[in-house]
UniProtKB/Swiss-Prot annotation:
CC terms in the record's Gene Ontology section: cytoplasm; nucleus
Source domain of life: Eukaryota
Organism expressing this protein natively: Drosophila melanogaster
UniProt KW Oxidoreductase keyword: yes
Xref: Gene3D superfamilies: 3.30.390.30, FAD/NAD(P)-binding domain
EC number: 1.8.1.-
Enzyme class per UniProt: oxidoreductase
Free-text disruption phenotype from the record: RNAi-mediated knockdown results in failure to emerge from the pupal case and in lethality.
UniProt entry tagged with the keyword Flavoprotein: yes
InterPro entries per record: FAD-bd_OxRdtase (IPR050260), FAD/NAD-bd_sf (IPR036188), FAD/NAD-binding_dom (IPR023753), FAD/NAD-linked_Rdtase_dimer_sf (IPR016156), Rubredoxin_C (IPR041575)
Name of the protein in its database record: Pyridine nucleotide-disulfide oxidoreductase domain-containing protein 1
Keyword set, alphabetical order: FAD, Flavoprotein, Oxidoreductase
Signal peptide from the UniProt entry: none
Function according to Swiss-Prot or TrEMBL: Probable oxidoreductase.
């Protein structure tokens, strides 16, 4: 069996769907095929500007049959790429000829157990793995979470009726996104909210997912979770009456060994702390949330060029080293000279941006035209929520790659806001806005325009001075 298309996009996550949608806009009459491993795909909806170049959005889960007529879909799995002949083979044996190919195959969870399959260790990444988590939680009383990123941070405080042991390698929580000061802000807020049995006021809300179950019950690699994924699922354990129990956090620690107990009674976990001491815990299962590896579980007739982190190397047009083969999202690594205020993080925001850019680039190539890289790659920006608070991250928000030649200004109002400016040579290089995100557009302008802020000194964050009046 074989079929033919002009544009073939592999992957049903945000990057893949964004690429296909972008192609449908620029080449509405072209044949576009989206190849996805799961019948459930993810698309961006309710796109709302937070600043001129920064947007917040919802992630919608839907069945491929609901995608509309702008492009075709096929539920199957990529097995082999024949770049010379411009065709691919799927796991089901179908041959698909293409003119342009975009790989948006996402990432697979990094499990501390490595390639060894352990039923007591699960990685949270897609809808299927969340269902597995729910099933295990139903009979669990003690759960260990390993990791310090967004998913680990959400899980640690969202799990109910269960003892949570949270193991982090850093000296503060949520180190992927925030600094120790912001981590302390969150820690205090969560403790006090727990004591009052209330939730923090949320200024930005997203629609919750409606639960959509895939038709196929296989081990297929589904699309990554988006924001607020945990809001629509029951994350309750078997310790009834202990709903508001706070997680016990083990800082600067790692798992040394895991010993399975008999009769599926869980595991004994040995932790090693930074000072060399050891501690033993017992848990029903382990959630490994330590990031993702680029998913390149397919073969190719010509070797793809990979970066050091395992991602497919792409240039500013999202092109790989193979002719007419592009890549976008978690599976790729940006291999172009980065702009002054931008760097790559494997987030749904950049998945959307890269997917859209790949689609625009492919459409231009098909018509013999050239395009410029999208301006979103001039400034890092991400909108999310952590512990119920809206969060906006801009530029080098944690001083990334600035060495030690920068200063930080912070304004913090307990349980309300945490605002941080990163300045270098009097210029704003990055900003972190938690709770109060009204300054997002002003910060964006200050970073991009390189305005000298030295004359304003510390007053730049004085709550009695409206800096928006100065820098609109």
């Amino acid at each position: 069996m074989s079929r033919k298309c002009e544009f073939l996009v592999v992957g049903g996550g945000i990057a893949g769907v964004s690429c296909a949608e972008s192609l449908a806009i620029y080449r509405p009459n072209a044949s576009i095929l989206l190849l996805t491993e799961s019948s459930i795909v993810k698309s961006v909806t309710n796109l709302v500007p937070v600043a001129r170049y920064l947007h917040k959005f919802d992630v919608r889960e839907q069945d491929v049959s609901e995608m509309g007529a702008s492009f075709q879909t096929l539920v199957d799995r990529l097995d082999h790429i024949n770049s010379r002949e411009h065709c691919i083979r799927t796991k089901a044996g179908l041959e698909i000829k293409y003119r342009y190919l975009c790989l948006c195959t996402g990432g697979t969870p990094k499990l501390f157990s490595g390639k060894v399959v352990n039923p007591l260790v699960i990685g949270i990444r897609d809808t299927d793995s969340v269902q597995l988590l729910q099933r295990k939680l139903a009979t669990a009383k003690d759960v260990l979470i390993l990791g310090n990123g967004g998913i680990a941070s959400e899980l640690a405080y969202e799990l109910k009726d269960v003892n949570v042991h949270w193991v982090v390698k850093d000296s503060h929580i949520s180190a992927t996104f925030v600094d120790p000061g912001a981590a302390e802000f969150f820690h205090i807020a969560m403790n006090e909210c727990n004591a009052k049995d209330s939730s923090p006021v949320v200024a930005i809300k997203r629609m919750r997912y409606s639960e959509v179950l895939p038709k196929e019950q296989t081990n297929n690699h589904g699309a990554a979770l988006g924001p607020d994924w945990h809001r629509s699922v029951d994350l309750s354990g078997a310790r009834e009456g202990e709903e508001n129990r706070l997680p016990k956090i083990y800082y600067k620690s790692r798992i040394s060994s895991v010993q399975d107990l008999a009769d599926d009674a869980g595991a004994i976990v040995k932790l090693e702390h930074e000072d060399g001491s050891f501690q033993q815990l017992t848990c029903d299962f382990i959630v490994s949330a330590t990031g993702v590896w680029p998913n390149t579980d397919y073969t190719c007739d010509s070797p793809l060029q990979f970066s050091d982190d395992g991602g497919i190397s792409v240039d500013e047009m999202m092109r790989t080293n193979l002719v007419d083969v592009f890549a976008a999202g978690d599976v790729c690594t940006a291999n172009w000279p980065a702009a002054m205020h931008w760097f790559q993080m494997r987030l749904w925001t950049q998945a959307r941006q890269m997917g859209s850019m790949a689609g625009r680039s492919m459409a231009a190539a098909s018509e013999g035209e050239s395009v410029y890289q999208d301006f979103c790659f001039e400034l890092f920006g991400h909108v999310t929520k952590l512990f119920g608070y809206p969060v906006v991250l801009l530029g080098r928000f944690n001083g990334q790659d600035l060495g030690r030649d920068y200063e930080i200004l912070v304004r913090c109002t307990r349980n309300k806001e945490y605002i941080k400016f990163v300045l270098q040579n009097g210029r704003l290089r990055g900003a972190m806005l938690i709770g109060n995100t009204d300054l997002a557009e002003t910060c964006e302008n200050l970073i991009l325009n390189g305005i000298d802020l030295e004359p304003y000194g510390d007053d730049i964050l004085n709550p009695d001075i409206d800096i928006e009046d100065y820098f609109d």
